[in-house]
Amino acid sequence: KSSAGAAERLPVARVANIGETIRRLKEQGVFVYCADMDGVPLRKNNLTGPIALVLGSEGSGVSQLVKKLCDGVVRLDMAAQGTGVDSYNVSVAAGIILYEIQSQRAAQNA
């Protein structure tokens, strides 16, 4: 229970039609980001407003169609480049991105 503490307060969704979901979120004023190795470095994005985050599968990532529907694409730089490891697993990537969102929002409210 304690390891999933934030899950009780963080809206997480698995949807049948991601394209339609992205369109609806954008209509409601939500800025939709996806994570991809070809994106803008995470810290260069303003993550303080209402946002949704799209994470792809560990094998194939986010599809090109979904990337085109998103408002922005974020990239997580690897600390240990040249080690043969070129990406984080999806749960680690989510944790890093959520931490940056929280950090930016805390700094904005300080």
Where are these regions (language model features)?
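Short glycine-/acidic-enriched loop or helix-start segments at secondary-structure transitions
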Residues: 43-45, 63-66
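RNA substrate-binding interface of SAM-dependent RNA methyltransferases
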Residues: 1-44
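Residues at secondary-structure transition points
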Residues: 16, 49, 57, 83-88
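Short Gly/Pro-enriched loop/turn and capping motifs at secondary-structure junctions
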Residues: 38-40, 58-61, 79-82
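Structured adenosyl-cofactor binding patch, chiefly the S-adenosyl-L-methionine
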Residues: 1-6, 64, 68-110
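Short loop/turn elements that form and flank the Walker-type P-loop nucleotide-binding site
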Residues: 27-29, 47-49, 69
